[in-house]
A protein has these predicted regions:
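Membrane-embedded translocation segments of transport machinery
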Residues: 2-7, 11-13, 176, 180-324, ...
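Transmembrane helix-boundary motif of multi-pass solute transporters/channels
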Residues: 16-53, 239-245, 255-259, 263-264, ...
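Inter-helical loop and helix-membrane interface segments of multi-pass membrane transporters/permeases
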Residues: 5-10, 37-41, 71-99, 112-168, ...
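Hydrophobic, membrane-embedded alpha-helices of multi-pass small-molecule transporters
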Residues: 12, 19-29, 104-108, 112, ...
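Helix-loop-helix connectors at the membrane interface of multi-pass transporters/channels
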Residues: 2-8, 115-147, 247-251, 256, ...
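A generic transmembrane alpha-helix motif of multi-pass inner-membrane proteins
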Residues: 381-401, 426-476
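Loop-to-transmembrane helix boundary motifs in multi-pass membrane proteins
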Residues: 16-18, 24, 153-154, 264-270, ...
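Membrane-interface "cap" regions at the ends of multi-pass membrane proteins
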Residues: 1-32, 59-66, 70-98, 249-253, ...
């Protein structure tokens, strides 16, 4: 790969970059996963642990991934090739970039299907389909959607085509223009819904649930879940922030932008939690009802409440915007790689990759109906297998390698140039990057893959390997 394969695109302003990166981070995880895992793990105590994990694990990797992208000046694969050469590191570090590009593309192949559910629900809500609906009606609607391959494939196709259309137009004409409309719209809708939440009569209960910690309800599994979600929610390890960082001019501060990204992502998750739990509690429903919270519990609430058609439609518009803004960032690393390294123009690259992702996505769409009895990894469906490999292997591995490279392989002067900080902040950042972040990721990584009776052994072996790498690195 040539050193000359550098990013020619750039963001028009730091504000647009922050909006795009926030759009990448704010997705279904904020509106779907965060509320239900908070509900399942006791509320306030879980939120407190989650915020600590964002600070100690998420932000160091966020800074590092953006810095590697800008210092490498290219897509994740080429950026790591450039950085390995410039810093005297092994050529194998290019695998970090390849892992991110593949992870993003694979996640998008099932993300478009799940995002399609939200588009379907937005349309159904707009038509008044959830007005006065009861729990049986919602359950039947959701089951009918999942049982229909044609419906799932239609919505999957719609989301895929939209995503590729935007990305094919480029950074300024496509992603920037879409984000400039979508992110302010998302924030406005969220604030309108928050205003409504204060009138439900359950806002105080919702606030107490989210922010009053009860540590008696906090388990070790809840801590692991908080650590894992803090890592995944910021869109780390899929190459999105690395390629977005490569478009960031040197005059803009990564540290300042990174803090805004982390703050905005966390704020959206917490505000969405306040909105969702206010509506759930006001209707006497359960906060810890799993993934069905978004697609089964909330439609019941909207169906029963005054103004439910309007606020339900607004809510699902919010979900659609969050899903689409993340979808664009998941494929951008691969499109940029095709364009810069393989000489395939952006428009052609986007549609070629879109076709491949659409084909893989068919497996996910069929996993809920025709292929529900077809198993790949153990007893997992095609969708569950893809989700398991990306979420439990590829993303943690990517995050771990980003932390290791930024902490030990990147020259200190390069790190200081990209991430200028005060001495105290720099020391805290480097300590977290070298020790806290890798150890936390190793623990989460192992807990997701290994049976509990072998967990401590695997963690000990993994930490010994990491310690060996550090010792060898210091000797050189």
């Amino acid at each position: 790969m040539s050193q000359l394969a550098l990013s020619k695109d750039s963001w028009s302003s730091q504000k647009v970059f922050v909006l795009a990166a926030v759009g990448s981070a704010v997705g279904l995880g904020n509106l779907w996963k965060f509320p239900y895992i908070t509900g399942e793990n006791g509320g306030g105590a879980f939120v407190l642990v989650y915020l600590a994990c964002v600070l100690l694990i998420g932000i160091p990797i966020l800074f590092s991934e953006l810095a590697l992208g800008r210092a490498g000046k290219a897509n994740p694969v080429q950026a790591m090739a450039n950085l390995a050469r410039e810093n005297g590191a092994s050529k194998l570090w290019v695998l970090l970039g390849i892992n991110g590009v593949l992870a993003g593309a694979l996640i998008l192949s099932f993300y478009t299907v799940i995002a399609g559910w939200s588009v379907s629900y937005f349309v159904e809500s707009l038509k008044g389909g959830f007005v006065a609906i009861d729990s049986t009606g919602v359950s039947e609607h959701f089951s009918a959607l999942l049982a229909s391959p044609l419906q799932l494939i239609f919505w999957h196709t719609l989301v895929t085509v939209f995503t590729m259309f935007v990305v094919a137009k480029g950074v300024k004409s496509g992603i920037e223009k879409t984000i400039n409309f979508m992110m302010p719209g998302l924030l406005l809708i969220l604030l309108v819904l928050l205003g409504y939440a204060t009138t439900t009569g359950a806002f105080g209960q919702s606030f107490s649930f989210l922010f009053n910690p009860d540590f008696s309800k906090l388990s070790w599994q809840a801590v692991l879940t908080a650590m894992g979600h803090a890592f995944f929610t910021l869109s780390l390890g899929v190459g999105a922030l690395m390629v977005y960082g490569s478009y960031l001019p040197k005059k803009y501060s990564i540290v300042k932008a990174g803090l805004w990204i982390a703050f905005a992502d966390t704020a959206v998750a917490l505000l969405a939690g306040l909105v969702i739990f206010s509506i759930v509690f006001a209707n006497g429903l359960e906060p810890g009802s799993g993934p069905g919270l978004l697609f089964q519990t909330l439609p019941i609430a909207f169906g029963e409440m005054t103004g439910g058609w309007f606020f339900g439609t607004l809510f699902f518009a919010l979900v659609v915007m969050a899903a689409l803004s993340s979808a664009m960032s998941l494929i951008e690393p691969a499109v940029s790689w095709f364009d810069q390294n393989w000489g395939i123009k952006r428009v052609k690259a986007a549609w070629i990759l879109g076709a491949l992702i659409w084909l893989i996505g068919l497996g996910t769409a069929l996993s809920f109906n025709e292929w529900s009895g077809v198993h790949f990894l153990g007893e997992r469906t095609f969708f569950d297998s893809l989700d398991f490999v990306t979420a439990n292997i590829m993303l943690p591995l990517g995050g771990l390698l980003i932390a290791v490279f930024a902490a030990w392989a990147l020259k200190p002067e390069v790190r200081s140039l990209e991430l200028p900080m005060s001495d105290s902040m720099s020391k805290a950042f480097l300590f977290s990057l070298k020790w806290v972040t890798p150890i936390a990721i190793i623990v989460v990584f192992a807990s997701n893959l290994v049976e509990s009776n072998n967990l401590l052994l695997v963690i000990a072996v993994s930490l010994a390997i990491y310690g060996g790498y550090v010792w060898n690195n210091k000797r050189q």
